[in-house]
Structure formats: C-alpha cells, structure tokens
Amino acid sequence: MAVAIEAPFHVLAVDDSLPDRKLIERLLKTSSFQVTTVDSGSKALEFLGLHDHEDSPISTQSDQQEVAVNLIITDYCMPGMTGYDLLKKIKESSYLRDIPVVIMSSDNIPSRINRCLEEGADEFFLKPVRLSDMSKLKPHILKSRCKEHYQQEQNLQSNSESNNSSNPTSENSSSSTSSNSHKRKAVDEEILPHTIRPRHS
C-alpha cells in the first residue's frame, strides 16, 4: 500500500545580498523547506505573478510558478523596492494577502519592526538569521493553511445554500403550473356536458 508523502512547504526568499541569500537558502533547506530565491522585490512580485502596480495575477507569468508559495521571507533594506514596500504590495493584493511574510534586517530599530508588524508582517528576524529561527516559520504557514481551508468551506457552504434556496422556487412554480392545469381540466369537464346537450323543439 503506497503511503502519501506530503510535499514540503515552499518558501520564497528575497535578498539583494548573495551571501545572505545563500545562508537563508541553506537554513531553509536544512529545515526541510522547498526554497526559491530572488534578489529583489520586483522579481519576487514577478515570480508571484503580480505586476508592481497591479492587483491581479499575470497570466503570462503564472505558468512559471509551478508550486504555490506558502511563505515569503524578505530582507528589509534592498535597493529599488524595500522589504517594507514588498510587504505592502502583498498585503494590498487580494490575490496574495494571505501568504505569511517574514521581514529580516541587520538593524534592530523598534520603530521599523513595529511598522512592519502593523502592516501585516508575521515575524521580524534580526540578521544573521539562525537555524532556530526556522522553527518559527511553520506555525505561520499552518495558520494560513487553516484560514484558507476555512474560507473554502465557507464558500462551498454559501454556494450550497444559494442553490438550495433557488430550487424551491422552481418546484413551487412547477407545482403551481400543474395545479392550474388540473383546475382548467375540471372546469372544461363541467362545461362540456352543457355545451353538447341536444335542444328540444
């Protein structure tokens, strides 16, 4: 009997520093995550299938994303699009907002950390990231999965209730049509004997 093997969680790691990207990739793989690395926020959005200025998936890019991204971990300080900017893009998108996002930074600046957490970041790691930090990722992925499944169940239930509420109307309509047909038949049968009665001279 074949045993189903659960696919590893897929993490998208974003960092403009090659040494830091290599480090986070190694830590994630050691922790049994599947990893994709990119060196900028714009490339991260491209991989996710989202333009910098759009809120919908790009059909031409979506094919390259062969597996769903379960979590995004990004550096804060990057040229062009910062990790904070990337976080905002993700949380503003109805398509991506439920993906957990973790921010990394070499600077321990409370105001920066609070701003990211208020914007929707799930964790804020100080660099250098350690192997022990990886254990904090899975709970966020599982929480996101549970939320996703709950929303799917709610949608299915809503669709089911919508279908059920529309059926009685058609049944009542059919029943009403049938009832009217019987009434007309009864009236015709009542009238018919009088119309064919012969006249007496």
UniProtKB/Swiss-Prot annotation:
Residues 158-180 have a biased composition (Low complexity). Induction: By cytokinin. Disulfide bonds: none annotated. CDD domains: REC_typeA_ARR (cd17581). Expressed in mature leaves, and at low levels in roots, shoots and flowers. The keyword Repressor does not apply. This is Two-component response regulator ORR9. It holds the Pfam family Response_reg. The modification 4-aspartylphosphate is found at residue 75. Functions as a response regulator involved in His-to-Asp phosphorelay signal transduction system. Phosphorylation of the Asp residue in the receiver domain activates the ability of the protein to promote the transcription of target genes. Type-A response regulators seem to act as negative regulators of the cytokinin signaling. Gene3D superfamilies: 3.40.50.2300. It comes from Oryza sativa subsp. indica. Residues 10-142 form the Response regulatory domain. Residues 149-201 are annotated as: Disordered. One of its GO terms (biological process) is phosphorelay signal transduction system. Two-component system major event consists of a His-to-Asp phosphorelay between a sensor histidine kinase (HK) and a response regulator (RR). In plants, the His-to-Asp phosphorelay involves an additional intermediate named Histidine-containing phosphotransfer protein (HPt). This multistep phosphorelay consists of a His-Asp-His-Asp sequential transfer of a phosphate group between first a His and an Asp of the HK protein, followed by the transfer to a conserved His of the HPt protein and finally the transfer to an Asp in the receiver domain of the RR protein.
